[in-house]
Amino acid sequence: VADLGIVGENEFKERNEDAEIVDRLGFSKCRLSLAIPKESKYEGVKWFNGKKIATSYPGILRKFLDKNNVKADIHVITGSVEISPGIGLADGIFDIVSSGSTLVSNNLKEVEVVMKSEALLIRNKQMDEDKMKTLQELLFRFDAVRSAQDKKYVMMNAPKSNIREIVEVLPGIKSPTI
């Protein structure tokens, strides 16, 4: 069993893993959405009543449909979910959407965003104290990288007599390193 992992939030929620979310990593962002043929008239989630929906995420979809009192048939498909309506396997789909270009190329339109997702750092709930200490050091480094993303590092050769003027033009976060 692994102590740490990086996983998409969508996979984490679908599999209902017994792990703890340690950090939201801010990359691999996408959304899980319902989509239907672009020529279909859509007036809300009740459109899916009695319809067939293809997905690789039946657990998340079932919770959403139940919450909205929608009775639909869920067809579990792994890979190329977006072709299902075009070949008559489903009336709509529930899948990952990033830019939406795959939906457009399959004559689909996004009609409901059910959940947003990004990469997560997760941990085994039974990590020992030494590993937790190492994890805290890793998180410190992650935070340092994130806080430095919009900052610039400037190095120069200048006479010490000009330090005051240089600091006025290029102040550091706390102070310059000399």
Predicted regions and their residues:
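Extracytoplasmic small-molecule ligand-binding "clamshell" domains
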Residues: 1-4
